[in-house]
Amino acid sequence: MSVILLNLKFLLCHYSPLIKKSMILNGKYHYICIAPREWEEYSSKNLKQLIVDSCKSHRQQTTCIHGAVTNIAGVSTKLEYYDLKLWMKKQGDNSAYPDQKDYFRMLLDL
């Protein structure tokens, strides 16, 4: 029961419209995640696990995943919401939207 309440608190934390655009399958929420191209060379499974672990750690400290900082192979990002997607925005990137030549999309299960 406490896991359900924790997940509900997480989902309602920051950005409830994001919930409406996520897909639920096998009891998990699936989101489109926009990640730096530098990370594209890593195995999908390992990359997803590193991002999920970073988000969970941040959620334990702040009750939401927005703002989670992830550093993989010297590329540091801060999670932002963009167009109902999770954007792992590179530190120092001042753009208002992700550029396709700098980022790629992947499915992330939370």
Swiss-Prot record:
The encoding gene is M3
The molecule here is called Uncharacterized protein M3
